[in-house]
């Protein structure tokens, strides 16, 4: 089983961004946490990050994964192109946000991408990724039986 984690713009700057909102952990810490989880669970995982919409769409279009966790970053709020690419992806998928987007500025409260995902986890910090990975792993393994 292969799971894909996609991180959008500015997530590579974790640890340097507003620590009151995003915490003290770095992007490398996040990747390490995800890779450790994958190793403990016997799952192959790829962590992909891009600040460019087209690169994210191209990665999704490869369709070479069994489950998806995506943090579209700011693209969450307006990228109908990523939304359409997600709609093509027919595997379990969860949108994740480190901060609680529903408790922040008005423009951050709308997600155009969540409606084409199985669900959304928001505001649980880096732990939200683990919850999302657990879900996509479980649902992917059940659907492959």
Swiss-Prot record:
EC numbers, comma separated: 4.2.1.10
Molecular-function annotations in GO: 3-dehydroquinate dehydratase activity
Database matches in Pfam families: DHquinase_II
Residues annotated for substrate binding in this entry: 71, 77, 84, 98-99, 108
Metabolic or biological pathway, per its Swiss-Prot or TrEMBL entry: Metabolic intermediate biosynthesis; chorismate biosynthesis; chorismate from D-erythrose 4-phosphate and phosphoenolpyruvate: step 3/7
EC primary class: lyase
Keywords: Amino-acid biosynthesis, Aromatic amino acid biosynthesis, Lyase
Site, Transition state stabilizer: residue positions: 17
CDD domains: DHQase_II
Any GO BP: amino acid biosynthetic process
Reaction catalysis annotation: 3-dehydroquinate = 3-dehydroshikimate + H2O
SUPFAM superfamilies on file: Type II 3-dehydroquinate dehydratase (SSF52304)
Membrane-crossing residue ranges in chain numbering: none
PANTHER family: CATABOLIC 3-DEHYDROQUINASE (PTHR21272:SF3)
Function: Catalyzes a trans-dehydration via an enolate intermediate.
Quaternary assembly: Homododecamer.
Family the entry assigns: Belongs to the type-II 3-dehydroquinase family.
Name under which the protein is recorded: 3-dehydroquinate dehydratase
Annotated source species: Thermotoga neapolitana (strain ATCC 49049 / DSM 4359 / NBRC 107923 / NS-E)
